[in-house]
């Protein structure tokens, strides 16, 4: 029999399902630390020029491997990430549309309208133009 106020759990306010998760997280963190330490300890300490060269099917590299990507590439990548995350929200809504009813339909319609307004604004600002601008192509009317 236990005296009043003493609990079996180390953290009585946490649910009992927390202990396996905490132990798993601790074990994974220790394993990662051990593997990183072993890689550092067992890894090669010396470097030379031949070890740092990229290996491409036995071909000797010529020139620099660094390529300058145009800035619009990064803009398109960021726009893709933003719209991809928003698509994830739409897919989540689509899986629960029966439970959400009319209120969910109104909310997702509002969400999609905001997305479309953002896309139109982006298009009008020239964020989706990849090539030369219209002013440089001579298509601007006076």
UniProtKB/Swiss-Prot annotation:
Catalytic reaction list: a quinone + NADH + 5 H(+)(in) = a quinol + NAD(+) + 4 H(+)(out)
Domain of life according to the entry: Bacteria
Recorded family membership: Belongs to the complex I subunit 3 family.
Name of the gene: nuoA2
UniProt keyword annotations, A-Z: Cell inner membrane, Cell membrane, Membrane, NAD, Quinone, Translocase, Transmembrane, Transmembrane helix, Transport, Ubiquinone
Pfam families referenced in this protein's UniProt entry, alphabetically: Oxidored_q4
Molecular function via GO: NADH dehydrogenase (ubiquinone) activity; NADH:ubiquinone reductase (non-electrogenic) activity; quinone binding
Catalytic EC class: translocase
Transmembrane portions of the chain: 18-38, 73-93, 104-124
EC number assigned by the record: 7.1.1.-
Record localization: Cell inner membrane
Name under which the protein is recorded: NADH-quinone oxidoreductase subunit A 2
Cellular component GO terms, alphabetical: plasma membrane; respiratory chain complex I
InterPro entries in UniProt: NAD(P)H_OxRDtase_bac/plastid (IPR023043), NADH_UbQ/plastoQ_OxRdtase_su3 (IPR000440), NDAH_ubi_oxred_su3_sf (IPR038430)
Organism: Geobacter sulfurreducens (strain ATCC 51573 / DSM 12127 / PCA)
Assembly and binders: NDH-1 is composed of 14 different subunits. Subunits NuoA, H, J, K, L, M, N constitute the membrane sector of the complex.
Described purpose of this protein according to its UniProt entry: NDH-1 shuttles electrons from NADH, via FMN and iron-sulfur (Fe-S) centers, to quinones in the respiratory chain. The immediate electron acceptor for the enzyme in this species is believed to be ubiquinone. Couples the redox reaction to proton translocation (for every two electrons transferred, four hydrogen ions are translocated across the cytoplasmic membrane), and thus conserves the redox energy in a proton gradient.
Membrane topology: Multi-pass membrane protein
